[in-house]
């Protein structure tokens, strides 16, 4: 798969929507594969290293990421968006002791729990950098 197809987050959103509609283990692995090769947007405060936004719900802290900038909507507050490889976000979530990574939390949310981080990180990339 060409990395350019992953660029706008559309493929990631479609994989998540398919999983939500046809919730199965196979579709979950498709989402994980797509996440493995995705660049996502992470809210953070400019000028402050490792100062990321968290969504707090029922005593848990989730690191939100967005498939593209539009998915954040008007909820930016004092945060800017940094574009990162999803596997780098996993490292940040571990470092911050997040209870999970919440993809597109304001539209069609998909939760990646800490127990799945290694599964995603160890997947072989399916993208090529050249068109």
Describe the residue ranges of each PLM region.
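An interfacial alpha-helical scaffold signature
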Residues: 1-131
């Amino acid at each position: 798969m060409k990395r350019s197809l992953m660029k706008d987050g559309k493929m990631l959103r479609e994989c998540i929507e398919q999983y939500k509609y046809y919730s199965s283990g196979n579709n979950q692995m498709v989402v994980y594969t797509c996440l493995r090769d995705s660049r996502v947007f992470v809210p953070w405060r400019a000028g402050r290293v490792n100062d990321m936004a968290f969504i707090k719900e029922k005593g848990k802290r989730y690191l939100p990421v967005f498939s593209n900038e539009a998915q954040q909507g008007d909820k930016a507050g004092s945060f800017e968006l940094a574009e990162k490889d999803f596997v780098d976000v996993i490292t940040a979530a571990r470092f911050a002791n997040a209870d999970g990574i919440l993809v597109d939390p304001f539209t069609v949310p998909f939760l990646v729990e800490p127990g799945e981080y290694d599964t995603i990180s160890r997947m072989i990339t399916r993208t090529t950098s050249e068109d």
